[in-house]
């Protein structure tokens, strides 16, 4: 898996964001991949924090990492190749690897024709990323999943 090489870790949580954001103290993250221990663990939404807590408390999760890989994808809107950084990668106790993207459920369904251009463009970009992630996962004997609030119900 390609290690990320961008400045995504420099994107600090924003207090003015409509999403609940912050840092998780490293000492509370006992299952982090060893190479990630010195990096700040940022959650960019309440769903991401809930997923971190899930990873830490689930006995089937051996270890996890936050934004550890870059996946190249073709962005149809800009017609260029870009890098996508999935939110998490987990390794299960049975040796499986799962690449995880966290999204609110309403961002995982195709927007209606009357929706804003921003939503339509976000949908195209996200589906480009997810297609590349599925191909990357298949190539690396892993699985790609999108986790929404429905995962925790």
Where are these regions (language model features)?
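Electrostatic, structured charged patches in enzyme active sites and in nucleic-acid/phosphate-binding
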Residues: 1-153
């Amino acid at each position: 898996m390609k290690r990320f090489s961008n400045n995504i870790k420099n994107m600090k949580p924003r207090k003015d964001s409509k999403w609940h954001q912050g840092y998780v103290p490293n000492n509370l993250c006992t299952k982090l991949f060893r190479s990630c221990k010195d990096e700040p663990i940022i959650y960019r939404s309440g769903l991401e924090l809930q997923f971190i807590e899930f990873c830490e408390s689930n006995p089937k999760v051996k270890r996890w990492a936050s934004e550890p890989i870059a996946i190249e994808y073709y962005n149809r809107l800009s017609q260029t190749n870009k890098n996508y950084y999935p939110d998490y990668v987990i390794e299960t106790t049975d040796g499986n690897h799962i690449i995880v993207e966290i999204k609110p459920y309403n961002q995982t369904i195709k927007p209606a024709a009357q929706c804003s251009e921003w939503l339509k463009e976000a949908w195209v970009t996200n589906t480009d990323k997810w297609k590349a992630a599925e191909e990357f996962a298949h190539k690396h004997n892993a699985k790609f999943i999108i986790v929404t609030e429905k995962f925790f119900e």
